[in-house]
Amino acid sequence: MSKTHRILFSLIALFLTVATIAQTRTALGRSQASINPDFETSGEYDSTQTVGEFYGTPVVSQPVAEVIQPAHVLGSTNENKRIEVDLTNQRLSAYEGDQKIYEFLISSGKWGRTPTGTFRIWSKFRYKNMSGGSKELRTYYNLPNVPYTMFFSNDAIPAARGFGIHGTYWHDNFGHPMSHGCINMRTEEAGLIYEWAGPVSGTNKYTRTTTENPGTEVVIFGVAPRE
């Protein structure tokens, strides 16, 4: 093989490598499912769709039991509440002022990055169908009736991006990144945060923030482990 041919083959190999990396990054960048904030307003359990798929494995959703809040948080106001998510240690903490009310393990983004910054919950769904990822990269997911979903946003990360905190029935690997960008929690623990955080939802299956019923602040920081 001549020197010219070797150079040509090297350039072709380099081009293919760059193209593959770009394709992978593009697929990962869109792995988090988007949402239409003005169209999707149902938080009801969909009994016609109970079987989904996560990472090539069939998964089945179940209706969740009603969460009973501990007495010490009943009647508390939203003004001094905040949620902190530590990506480095894969933990979520809920505060009222300086008092820590809850601390739970979570799973943040693995196939898609969880954004960092200060956000506000803008809507809550008792149940929410979610799908996204990439079949080519084998990260596709189709998850019906995701429980206790709390979507958050800020000026840089709009509501349509679909980032949220929610319960999880398709894995039990908390403490390790396992999501496409959202914050995965054990379902019963997500239920406690859901009932505690604003906007106050009461018996409503879907609630959106208003001036009179604001969403709780969510602060996300750190760097998730690479696993």
Please report, for each region that a protein language model flagged, where it lies by residue.
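Gly/Pro-biased beta-strand-loop elements
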Residues: 56-173, 227
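Exported/periplasmic cell-wall-interacting domains
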Residues: 2-37, 125-128, 132-227
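N-terminal, intrinsically disordered, polar/charged segments of Gram-positive cell-envelope systems
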Residues: 28-76
